[in-house]
Design a protein with these regions (language model features):
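Conserved, single-site charged/polar hotspot
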Residues: 7-12, 16-509
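Sec-dependent signal peptide recognition
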Residues: 1-7
Length: 509
């Protein structure tokens, strides 16, 4: 929710239909889409630094709303604070409360919105459709992923937008509990700590910024050099005990992914988040010798296609068959993310693609030759009930009634479900691609078959954990343990992509 939401008008109105039109009054002039925010700096290929949000949407979202104080503590010694008004302080700990500050003039925000989307990737595809038509569209995540554009923009083909208008009359401001009493800070607030900042049971090196976002709230951002960032990502994504070649492959992918996605939160003034909506980023100091070696051995190496970092997506387990990009997200196929059986030649020969329904059943029943078959969710089973399906479709249950059927409408070449139909006595709801797992979060993947049991119950037999595109971490661990190099592993999962050093030959993120 945006702060000081005193008006929410014209929600779910089609293009060309404004509340003001009904009275004959002239529509209001176009306003800003969101609170003004400076874009994060461009990344220097020679000395790449990422702005990573350690905490987003900080502070209350409305007058009278409660928000916990922000506690910032130096690992040892002191923190140096400087706010935009030039105030400075050196203290071992900062405790920041929030005060609601009225605006001198109300801020009217008006935008046309597509979404919500299940992922940034799907939202970005819709944004690209708008941009191709000359519309200045941005991707934002107030809660779920959305695409915002000027209110008069015509919807791109295949999507129906809604108009959102809010009038904000105030916003939260940070108030430092100083020894001399409460002191209102002017953002952005910069923080430095020679020993690092204690955060989320770890220590981060910084420097840091407390800055405003596109929603009228605040974000705690760490400005972290790319190679140090990897120390906080690699062990948490693949596991510090993985074989060295698997760690090195993960380091290249994490680096490539970060650069390719450095625009992900541009609307909020930073590059990346620190949770599963980006790459899980935690205390870099916890990286062991093997992780540091993998990062050092691949220093500044990225995978590219036509000189640009690729979509370096990866996941835990593909269940024995990799997904194509277009099977996971709405978008065109990518030449380096293709569906493929992930196993030795004998397994590839047994299961030619596209997989037929009987072949998929056979693969799920066996497939132990596949790389990464020792993963805990290489094979799985889930039971869905009518009550659970009704919960999953939310408001749509009002027009379908209690679910009575569950049917796969479409599969991709790898056998993954592209469209899942939930049937009711009054209608149907179709979940597509990444929206399937967004709605049914208990499903480890979209590689599954459906069997109806007794009335109102369905059994799903599936394989893999994650979206299935790109590198399978379980598969990479298997291949590394068999002596494959990191380069060979990357060539296997991203055929045709080139391994390049960032900053050489004009290479830029």
């Amino acid at each position: 929710m945006l702060p000081a939401l005193v008006a929410l008008l014209a929600v779910l109105l089609p293009a060309g239909c404004r509340a003001a039109d009904d009275t004959g009054a002239a529509p209001p002039p176009p306003g800003p889409l969101h609170w003004p925010v400076a874009a994060p700096p461009a990344i220097d290929p020679g000395r790449p630094v990422l702005w990573v949000a350690l905490a987003a949407h900080v502070g209350p979202d409305a007058p009278g709303a409660q928000a916990p104080p922000l506690r910032l503590q130096a690992a040892s010694g002191t923190l140096r604070l400087r706010d935009a008004a030039g105030r400075t302080a050196d203290v071992p700990e900062l405790l920041i409360d929030w005060r609601w500050q009225p605006l001198e003039q109300p801020l009217r925000l008006r935008r046309r919105v597509l979404g919500p989307f299940a992922s940034f990737e799907s939202a970005e595809q819709a944004a690209e459709r708008w941009r191709a038509a000359g519309v200045a569209a941005v991707v934002a995540r107030p809660r779920d992923w959305e695409v915002w554009a000027p209110v008069a923009s015509a919807d791109p083909a295949g999507w129906t937008g809604r108009v959102v208008e809010v009038v904000a009359t105030g916003r939260p401001v940070p108030v430092w509990r100083s020894a001399k009493g409460p002191l209102t800070l002017q953002g952005p607030v910069t923080l430095e700590a020679a020993s690092g900042l204690r955060w989320a049971q770890g220590v981060h090196g910084g420097p840091f910024r407390l800055q405003s976002d596109a929603h009228g709230r605040w974000t705690l951002v760490e400005q972290v050099p790319l190679e140090r960032y990897l120390e906080g990502v690699v062990p948490h994504e693949i596991g510090a005990g993985s074989p060295q070649a698997a760690l090195a492959a993960q380091a290249v992918l994490a680096r490539t992914w970060a650069l390719r996605n450095s625009h992900r939160f541009a609307v909020d003034g930073y590059h990346l988040c620190a949770d599963t909506q980006c790459q899980v980023y935690s205390d870099p100091r916890q990286a062991g010798a093997s992780v540091r070696r993998a990062i050092a051995d691949t220093r500044l190496q990225v995978l590219t296609w036509d000189g640009r970092p690729i979509h370096a997506v990866y996941h835990a387990s593909n269940g024995g068959v990799s997904a194509g990009f277009e099977e996971v997200w709405s978008g065109s196929p990518l030449p380096y993310l293709r569906p493929a059986i992930d196993g030795p030649d004998s397994l590839v020969a047994r299961f030619p693609l596209p997989l037929t329904p009987p072949a998929l059943v056979s693969l799920l029943a066996d497939g132990r030759q596949a790389y990464g078959s020792d993963h805990g969710r290489f094979r799985w089973q889930r039971l869905l009930t009518a009550d659970r399906l009704q919960q999953a479709i939310g408001a749509d249950a009002g027009r379908t009634g209690r679910p009575t059927g569950l049917r796969v409408l479409e599969r991709g070449p790898s056998g993954r479900v592209l469209a899942l139909e939930i049937q009711g006595p009054s209608g149907v709801v179709v979940l597509r691609r990444d929206a399937i797992r967004r709605s049914l979060r208990e499903l480890p993947s979209t590689l599954f078959t459906v069997e109806a049991l007794a009335s109102g119950r369905w059994r799903l037999d599936g394989g893999g954990f994650g979206h299935g595109a790109g590198l399978s971490q379980a598969g990479a661990i298997t291949l590394a343990s068999r002596g494959w190099t990191s380069r060979r592993i990357l060539e296997h999962y991203y055929p045709g992509a080139a391994l390049q050093v960032l900053g050489l030959n004009g290479q830029a993120p």
